[in-house]
């Protein structure tokens, strides 16, 4: 029953926000398998992130008021004083080093509140969608993020393109991220304890979810 702040998983699966309509799925819904993924010893069914979005999630969790307005306010405030973090990314026999505003690892095309950063992500395709927003000036940053939200296209991860593209969007079944500056981490929108290395891997057909 979608009763959270963003309800990203429910939106991705087409589950109604109305509680009574969502309850109808117990009798009329389809129990379909969806993927999940591991982040070291933790579990995620939707997405996790390092850097900017995780910083906002940590601040949001301790804020006196909740809701979309508070989240937007915190996002805007942090956008105008961005921190770029050093990361190493290993996937598909490729290794890159970069300075990035954030990295999102998505199993769902929903971040919450109908906002997406990985528009090609699917709950049941056996793949993780990884978005790396590399260091750039604020004007380019805003334009590139809006372009990614509207029409992000999946790239092939390579050493030639890894830190050259301002936004890198690729898919993988597993990856490892080194995080030497301990950029903050969120898992499914909730603040989580970060680590200097994160091993991330898809779990195909992890559980069944009642959906329309």
PLM features per residue range, with description:
Residues 65-70, 119-140:
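Gly/Ser/Thr-rich active-site loops/lids in small-molecule metabolic enzymes
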Residues 2-4, 12, 47-49, 110, ...:
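Short glycine/serine/threonine-biased micro-segments
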Residues 53-56, 97-99, 111-114, 138-142:
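Short acidic/glycine-rich loop or secondary-structure boundary segments that cap or lie
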Residues 83-85, 99-101, 124-129, 173:
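A generic structural signal for short beta-strands and their flanking turns/coil linkers
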Residues 1-101, 105:
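Catalytic core of DAGKc-family lipid kinases
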Residues 91, 122, 134-212:
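ATP/nucleoside-binding phosphotransfer catalytic cores, i.e., glycine-rich phosphate-binding loops
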Residues 49, 104-119, 191:
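Glycine-rich phosphate/pyrophosphate-binding beta-alpha loops
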Residues 94, 110, 182:
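Short, glycine-/Ser/Thr-/acidic-enriched flexible segments
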């Amino acid at each position: 029953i979608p009763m959270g702040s963003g309800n990203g998983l429910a939106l991705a699966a087409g589950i109604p926000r109305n509680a009574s309509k969502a309850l109808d799925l117990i009798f009329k819904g389809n129990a379909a398998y969806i993927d999940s993924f591991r982040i070291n010893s933790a579990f995620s069914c939707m997405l996790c992130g390092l850097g900017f979005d995780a910083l906002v999630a940590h601040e949001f969790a301790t804020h006196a008021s909740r809701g979309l307005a508070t989240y937007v306010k915190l996002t805007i405030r942090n956008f105008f004083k961005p921190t770029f973090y050093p990361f190493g990314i290993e996937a598909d026999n490729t290794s890159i080093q970069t300075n990035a505003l954030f990295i999102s690892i998505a199993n769902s095309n929903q971040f919450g509140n109908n906002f997406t950063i990985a528009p090609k992500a699917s709950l049941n395709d056996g793949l993780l969608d990884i978005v790396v927003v590399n260091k750039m000036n604020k004007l380019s940053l805003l334009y590139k993020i809006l372009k990614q939200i509207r029409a992000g296209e999946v790239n092939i991860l390579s050493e030639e393109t890894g830190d050259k593209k301002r936004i890198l969007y690729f898919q993988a079944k597993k990856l490892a991220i080194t995080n030497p500056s301990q950029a903050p981490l969120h898992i499914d929108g909730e603040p989580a304890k970060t680590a200097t290395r994160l091993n991330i891997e898809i779990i195909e057909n992890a559980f069944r979810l009642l959906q329309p």
